[in-house]
Swiss-Prot record:
EC number assigned by the record: 3.1.1.7
Localization: Synapse; Secreted; Cell membrane
Gene coding for it: ACHE
GO cellular component, one term: synapse
Presence of keyword Nucleotide-binding: no
Predominant localisation class: other
This protein's name: Acetylcholinesterase
Family as reported in the entry's similarity comment: Belongs to the type-B carboxylesterase/lipase family.
Organism: Gallus gallus (Chicken)
Pfam family, one: COesterase
Region ranges (Disordered): 401-504
Length: 767
């Protein structure tokens, strides 16, 4: 009888994740023990019907990045603190520029920090239901702000309503922004760049380690973010450093392959030097340069950021993630479209049977071997004709028909067989990849993979690292390839080049939900584009429209700008000021958000990933911006976080129900990978490469659309790259052709020498 009694007692006893998982040393003050120490939160109301949530605010997840730690990746807290730390107030915001364009206007000031700013800002917030007996999903929010601003303390990011409504654990973390988060001297240990992304990654690791302590399931972590936060989510999807830390991802109005979201390593150095000049720290010896910058007050460093970017641009930011060969292994478009060693994958820019984006129509890709990004065992000859495709020859940016990973651009728009292009400095990219650069759509010059800047070839050219291969991977002739050394960040290859880690495979492992709002561009136009303003109808003259195109597509060539004008003009009514305004809305939104995002969706789905897409097209009744701006960038967030559930916010009844429905979609997706369930009405279908279906999210019952901006996005992803490839300066093309041919010959010669040395040591039976 005693064993049965003990068994019943065990079954009925509360578990650590039951309604009594929190300890209470005082009323309404729940306590949780984490891996870094114990914290004491508070119970707070969470909407109508007496709902409550437990909030733990301002939990540190890293050593404060002060003094010599400025510009460095974050350090985890080395030992747990003693005693119980109060987690009942919002943390400091990270240092950032404050928007003063419209003083006193809440529509813009709602995005400014509402807490004191400090470099001691690496804290996170956790909201969870008071007594949920299950292990709910964990939703981890990454805020947007162009990598220049943002804070977890903003009212619009209050996670209590979402946590209570969806019985979820909701987390948000601060990360460093601006130059303090993204100043980049790639390869320098004291300022490698992307430390803001490393902040996010360390917070994500902390969440995974402590999810159970808050009642969450560490195997059901979903990353979600908006704008730069969505781009950050995408970087984690593609980075090998974040693999395994989360299960699902939501990208709201942003993606890592947007033309504003990354720069190259050389451009990162140029911007760092420009900042140094502005604050009195001349660029030279990089260690001394960084020492000078660390000696400046944070506010002075931020003020210097204003001179880094030209003022005549829209949707561009001074300090953003850099392709460092480590966290951001390669440019996002290459990481998405390249295969990076997965056998049988499609080629980097050739998609079997699909339209895709990035200037490829029905390409075959790479057959077997190493797959896309860096060339392979052989490229099937076919009739692909994309901006990077070549008919019967070089099929993609980094591939060759025979050989091993020759670096170059492939061919021109007409499929001519050409040798790879020469080394290009990653100078400021123009909007479509004009000479010396690349953009998110891969126009004219694709960004090169990370390379050690100290490894010259025989002609003095800096060589890229060779791609990964295993010992069983045959080369073009069937010979097994010599094994590569261990791939860590310090292991040289045969030529002394340091090898970047291989990126997380793009697609097939993480379910993705993504989408945009109806008018993505209007919010940015009021910040300096002539003719636009929040207090007028922004009726745009033809002259203002033409000037706005140059600002909306920064650094575009004359021909590219003319193509944009041609495509977005209603030539039956070219001087109509309303149509000119709406066209600029569309140009900025399509170029920066919608088309990159849908290209991301297309590729993720083509690689086997499960994707759901949406268009949010409800204009909030509380929106303070003028009606001509429509449903602007960022104004779905309040519905995702459940702010309409708070009666004091004065939303309509229909908006309360819309918010409940959207929270249910997000919660369902976090739990199961499918937004459907418990909502009623039509089902939200998955996005597929052929159907391209997406859901309209508004106050009406769900409806389904097909091909979100598909036709217009073909202009950005197909036509313009071909146009730029076909019209480069002939004298430059000839010079580049000759130079790169010699580099290519030298590279292949050294590869053959290494292979012959290996084959003498270990004869290859398959030769």
């Amino acid at each position: 009888m005693a064993p049965l009694f003990l068994l019943l007692l065990l079954l009925l006893s509360p578990s650590p994740t039951s309604a009594h998982r929190f300890a209470y040393s005082a009323p309404n003050r729940p306590e949780v023990r984490t891996t870094t120490g114990s914290v004491r939160g508070l119970l707070i109301p969470a909407g109508p019907s007496g709902s409550t949530a437990a909030a733990f605010l301002g939990i540190p997840f890293a050593v404060p990045p002060l003094g010599p730690l400025r510009f460095r990746p974050p350090l985890p807290i080395p030992t747990p603190w003693t005693g119980i730390r109060d987690a009942d107030s919002q943390p400091f915001a990270c240092y950032q520029m404050v928007d003063t364009t419209f003083p006193g206007f809440q529509g813009s000031e709602m995005w400014n920090p509402n807490r004191e700013m400090s470099e001691d800002c690496l804290y996170l917030n956790v909201w969870t239901q008071k007594g949920d007996p299950t292990e709910p999903p964990v939703l981890v929010w990454i805020y947007g702000g162009g990598f220049t601003g943002g804070s977890v303390s903003l009212d619009v990011y209050d996670g209590r309503y979402l946590a209570a409504a969806e019985e979820a654990v909701v987390v948000s973390m601060n990360y460093r922004v601006g130059s303090l988060g993204f100043l980049a001297l790639a390869g320098h240990r004291d300022a490698p760049g992307n430390v803001g992304l490393w902040d996010q990654r360390l917070a994500l690791q902390w969440v995974r380690d402590n999810a159970e302590a808050f009642g969450g399931d560490p195997d059901l972590i979903t990353l979600f973010g908006e704008s730069a936060g969505a781009a950050s989510v995408g970087f984690h999807l593609l980075s090998p450093h974040s693999k395994g830390l989360f299960r699902r991802a939501v990208l709201q109005s942003g993606s890592p392959n947007g033309p504003w979201a990354t720069i190259g390593a050389a451009e990162g150095r140029r911007r760092a030097a420009a900042l140094g000049r502005a604050v009195g720290c001349p660029y030279g010896n990089e260690t001394e340069f960084l020492g000078c910058l660390r000696g400046k007050e944070a506010a002075d460093v931020l003020e210097g950021e204003g001179v880094v970017m030209p003022p005549q641009s829209v949707f561009r930011f001074a300090f953003v993630p850099v392709v460092d060969g480590d966290f951001v292994v390669d440019s996002p478009d290459v990481a998405l479209w390249g295969d990076y060693g997965v056998k049988g994958g499609e080629g980097g820019h050739g998609v079997e049977g699909g339209d895709g984006g990035y200037g490829v129509k029905g390409g075959d890709g790479v057959k077997g071997g190493y797959g896309g990004g860096y060339g392979a065992r052989g490229v099937r000859e076919g009739d692909g004709d994309g901006g990077y495709g070549v008919k019967e020859g070089l099929r993609e940016g980094y591939g060759v028909k025979e050989g091993y990973g020759v670096e170059g651009d492939g061919a021109n728009a007409y499929g001519a067989r050409v040798p790879p292009r020469p080394h290009r400095d990653e100078t400021p990219p123009d909007a479509y990849g004009a000479k010396g650069s690349a953009d998110a759509y891969g126009a004219k010059a694709a960004p090169r993979p990370h390379r050690d800047e100290t490894s010259p070839d025989a002609y003095g050219a800096k060589m890229p690292p060779r791609p990964h291969r295993d010992e069983a991977s045959p080369d073009t002739y069937g010979a097994k390839m010599p094994p590569r050394p261990h791939r860590d960040e310090t292991s040289p290859d045969a030529y002394g080049a340091k090898m970047p880690p291989r990126p997380h495979r793009a697609g097939g492992e993480v379910e993705v939900l993504l989408g945009a709002v109806r008018v993505e561009g209007s919010y940015f136009l009021v910040y300096g584009v002539p003719g636009f303003g929040k207090d007028n109808e922004s009726l745009i003259s033809r002259e203002e429209f033409l000037g706005g195109v140059r600002m909306g597509v920064p650094q575009a060539t004359e021909l590219a700008a003319e193509a944009v004008v041609l495509h977005y003009t209603d030539w039956l009514d070219a001087d109509n000021p309303v149509k000119n305004r709406e066209a600029l809305d569309d140009i900025v939104g399509d170029h920066n958000v919608v088309c990159p995002l849908m290209a991301f969706a297309q590729r993720w789905a083509q690689r086997g990933g499960k994707v759901y897409a949406y268009l949010f097209d409800h204009r909030s009744s509380t929106l303070l911006w003028p009606s001509w701006m429509g449903v602007p960038h960022g104004y779905e967030i309040e519905f995702v976080f459940g702010l309409p559930l708070e009666p004091r916010n004065n939303y309509t009844r229909e908006e309360v129900e819309l918010s409940r429905r959207i929270m249910r979609y997000w919660g369902n997706f976090a739990r199961t990978g499918d937004p459907n369930g418990g909502v009623g009405g039509p089902r939200w279908p998955p996005y597929t490469p052929s159907g391209q279906r997406y859901a309209h999210l508004n106050a009406r019952p769900l409806s389904v659309g097909h091909g979100l901006r598909t036709q217009i996005c073909a202009f950005w992803t197909r036509f313009l790259p071909k146009l730029l490839n076909a019209t480069g300066p002939p004298e430059d093309a000839e010079r580049e052709w000759r130079l790169e041919f010699h580099r290519w010959s030298s590279y292949m010669g050294r590869w053959r020498t290494q292979f012959e040395h290996y084959s003498r040591q270990q004869p290859c039976a398959t030769l």
